[in-house]
A protein has these predicted regions:
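Short beta-strand/turn micro-motifs composed of small residues
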Residues: 36, 59-61, 148
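A Rossmann-like FAD-binding core segment of flavoenzymes
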Residues: 1-5, 9-30, 50-136, 140
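A conserved FAD-binding loop/helix module that cradles the flavin
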Residues: 41-44, 63-76, 132, 138-141, ...
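Glycine-rich Rossmann-fold phosphate-binding loop(s) that bind the pyrophosphate
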Residues: 36-38, 126
Length: 170
């Protein structure tokens, strides 16, 4: 389940989720501000840039791909190289403060604000576990296990690993 932000202007039509963009449910404009430089944010930015969009990633941390579970070193190097190759601008140590009609207002760690123009703002600031289905089925199915993103938002490797562990130990 995606983490939602509560900021001024976040309800505007130009604000989209990375999941909606990747699933094809929503289309972006030509210039895109990607809020969140984690793995899904960077992969979404790359997807958009390969489609001809002008993309800027804004990340609150010191570097992109530094939140959450570490990714394999060679994958990280390749992804960073691809972001550069496709001309994706990266702005670190900044956060989204507000969505405006023309784009957004960012704020850095020294509380300096800057306005940026963007047709679309794509939000990808993380995920949290979703136990809705598990809770609905708990007590109704004898052998029900909480794994994958229902247990903890992570990546496909963790989901497969936990399923394998349960399969081997049942």
């Amino acid at each position: 389940k995606e983490i939602k932000l509560k900021l001024p202007g976040i309800e505007k039509e130009k604000v989209l989720s990375a999941v909606d963009v990747l699933n094809g449910r929503k289309k972006t404009g030509d210039s895109v501000l990607m809020v969140g430089g984690g793995l899904v944010g960077c992969e979404t930015a790359l997807y958009l840039a390969k489609s001809g969009k002008k993309v800027t990633i804004v990340e609150a941390k010191d570097d992109i791909l530094s939140a959450g579970k570490p990714i394999p070193h060679m994958n990280r190097i390749m992804l960073v190289d691809l972001l550069k190759f496709y001309g994706i601008k990266v702005v670190t140590c900044n956060s989204l403060l507000e969505v405006t009609d023309k784009g957004a207002v960012l704020i850095d760690r020294e509380f300096k604000k800057q306005s940026v123009t963007a047709d679309s703002i794509v939000i990808c600031v993380g995920f949290k576990s979703n136990r809705k289905l598990y809770n609905k089925l708990h007590g109704k199915i004898a052998k029900l296990y909480l794994i994958g993103d229902a247990f903890k938002a992570s990546n496909i490797m963790d989901a497969v690993w936990s399923a394998n562990e349960i399969g081997l130990n049942c």
